[in-house]
Amino acid sequence: GLVGSEMCIRDSSMEPGEEQPFSQYSIQVDAEGFRPFTVSGIELFSKQLSLQEVRMDEVDAPGNPVDTIVIPVNTLWGDFPPKIAESEIKPISETGEIVLSRVVVPEYVVVHDGPPNDTTARDYYVRYKDYIKNVASSEIYSTWPDATLRANILAIMSFTLNRVYTEWYRNKGYSFTITSSTAYDQKFTYGRNIFQSISDIVDEMFQNFLSRPNVSQPILTQYCDGERVTCSNWLSQWGSKYLGDQNYEAIEILRYYYGNNMYINTAEEVSGIPASWPRVDLTIGSTGEKVRQIQEELARISRSYPAIPTVTPDGIYGPATREAVEVFQRVFGLPVTGVIDYRTWYKISEIYVAVSRIAELV
């Protein structure tokens, strides 16, 4: 871990101003048998513990290992596009898709590192808690009052879980959970440092989200900085800081912005990346987005399990898809039917997450 430097004036993170409220450092890590690893732009605040994780690749690691990370500045200081307004509750019937039957905290989210339609951007498989810590460390200052940090983290988590619950991007034909674009979602920076004060709160509260009465989905709690960009009925990041200074509790801060009928709710944890089963078995003749999704997952799995034939993700369940499903079922000890039922759907999802995660770590 990296300990905050006293060179930085603590008060400059307490109100907007001309002085950058954090110092920035670079580190290089060297270890015998591993490629050198460099991180630049690590942010340090006075009296704050900053934590930097480094994953090093062996010298002869295959592929194209990442060995340099450049961390952009916090969104409160830097110039990032403002959030494009959306409705906070999604009309599920619009897509005709069955969404997740309950609110869950996924083990992993898939983060698309760019705007949704940027096909060159990488997708990262990130543990949910690590994702929330990363976003909060990118969006707000760790020096702020505890209640302010909690209110902002709750808004970040509820926003994320709405994307998970509604399968927002999957239903638009994408294969990720959320993007790193501030115009569409929230700031995420692969490999950035996080802050102990934020990390501790996320570890304590990660199963929470924000609810309104008689609404099953987590609320898409949008927010803005409140200084350069103002937003009615959304949380103001700087405004929430001033309310924290006035000893408002986290829920009081949230109700100040989102209204008095906002409540803190609790979700259950699940493993992997949840994606809803279409409620009907997929078999020869089935077509559509769910078929294409499962074909993409099988295609990725077949790279790690070559016995499974490669399928073309065309959204049509033909003989080649049935054959791939039969081999998958045989390999993983399921009844060999060539039909994707509930058990097979979730087993494919589980194995897909596992092989994708291993690829991220290699």
Model-derived features: positions:
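Conserved, single-site charged/polar hotspot
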Residues: S5, Q24-V362
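Short, small-residue-biased leader/transition segments that mark boundaries at the very start
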Residues: L2-C8
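Short glycine/proline/serine/threonine-rich loop/turn segments at secondary-structure transition edges
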Residues: R10-S23
